[in-house]
Amino acid sequence: MGCTVSAEDKAAAERSKMIDKNLREDGEKAAREVKLLLLGAGESGKSTIVKQMKIIHEDGYSEEECRQYRAVVYSNTIQSIMAIVKAMGNLQIDFDDPSRADDARQLFALSCTAEEQGVLPEDLSCVIRRLWADNGVQACFGRSREYQLNDSAAYYLNDLERIAQSDYIPTQQDVLRTRVKTTGIVETHFTFKDLHFKMFDVGGQRSERKKWIHCFEGVTAIIFCVALSAYDLVLAEDEEMNRMHESMKLFDSICNNKWFTDTSIILFLNKKDLFEEKITHSPLTICFPEYTGANKYEEAASYIQSKFEDLNKRKDTKEIYTHFTCATDTKNVQFVFDAVTDVIIKNNLKDCGLF
C-alpha cells in the first residue's frame, strides 16, 4: 500500500513540477512579448518613429520601397510651396520680384496634374525653384507659425535640384521626412534584445482618436509623442487651440486613465532640433504666459518637461520616463529606444515575478 501512495505522490510531484515549469515558460514568453502603443496629437512624429524602427531593426527601406516614396516627396514639396504662396496673400506679403506672380499662377496651374500623376516635371521644378529663391517667399516662410506648413518644407525645397533629377530615388532620410496623415492603425513587428515587439501607430488628429480604444488591452508600454516645436502653433483641425495645450490635455487623459494604471508611460519630447532653432526668436510665453525663464533651449525644454510630468496624478506609484528626441535622427532614436527597452525588460520581469 505504501508503495502505491509513494508512486502517486511521485506522479503528483512530477505533474506539479511540470505545471510550474510551464507557468514559468509562459511567464518568460509573456515577458518577451511587448505591445507598444504610440500615442500623441497630430504631427508629433509618431509615424517617423515607426519608420525608424524599420531602419534600425529591419534593415531599412529597400531601393524599391524608397522608389515608392517618390510621389510622396513630390507631393510634400509641391504642397509646401503652395502653402507658403497662399499664405503670402493672407499675410499681405509681396513678392520681391513682381514677375514671380506669373510663376505663382504657373504653380497652381501645373501642380494638380503633377500630384495626380506623382511626378515633378522640369517646368514645375523650375517654377518652384524661382519662387523659393524670392525674398518675399522667404519672408513668408519665416512667419510659418501663422499658417499650417509641413516641418519638412525647407528640407525638400532646399534640395530641389537633387529631388528634381529624372533618376531621383529617395534616400532613407527623404523617406523619414515624408508626411502622410495616419488614418486608422499601422502595426509594425520587430525583434530587439530577445523581445518581440508589436508597435501600434494610431492617427493623432481628433477624428482618429476614437479608433484607439480597442488597442488598449494588454499594452506593455505607451510611447507618447509631443512636438516640442509646436508650442507656438495652432491645430490644423481647430485654429483656436494651441497645439501644445492640446497635447497636454491628451497626455493628461492618457497618463491618468484607469486603463493604464500598470502601464509604463514613456514621454518622447520630440522635434528638439526644430525647438532649439525656434526658441531663440519665438518666445515660450506664446504658449505659457506665466513662464519667466530664458528663451534658451535647456531652460525652456526643462520647463515643458515639468509641465507634462506635473500632469501625473499618481507620482508616488507611477513614473514617467521622459526622453528628448529628434525622430528624424536615426542615431538619437536608436540610443533612446535602447534605454526604453531596458526599462521595459525590467518592468516586464517584475510583473512576471522574475525580477
Swiss-Prot record:
Q: Which family does it belong to?
A: Belongs to the G-alpha family. G(i/o/t/z) subfamily.
Read off the SUPFAM superfamilies from this record.
Answer: P-loop containing nucleoside triphosphate hydrolases, Transducin (alpha subunit), insertion domain
Quaternary structure?
A: G proteins are composed of 3 units; alpha, beta and gamma. The alpha chain contains the guanine nucleotide binding site. In this context, interacts with GNB2. Interacts with UNC5B. Interacts with GPSM1. Interacts with RGS12 and RGS14. Interacts (inactive GDP-bound form) with NUCB1 (via GBA motif); the interaction leads to activation of GNAI3. Interacts (inactive GDP-bound form) with CCDC88C/DAPLE (via GBA motif). Interacts (inactive GDP-bound form) with CCDC8A/GIV (via GBA motif). Interacts with CXCR1 and CXCR2.
| Natural source organism | Canis lupus familiaris
Does the record's keyword annotation contain Transmembrane helix?
no
The record's InterPro entries line, in alphabetical order, gives: Gprotein_alpha_I, Gprotein_alpha_su, GproteinA_insert, P-loop_NTPase
Is Nucleotide-binding found in the keyword set? Answer: yes
The protein here is known as Guanine nucleotide-binding protein G(i) subunit alpha-2
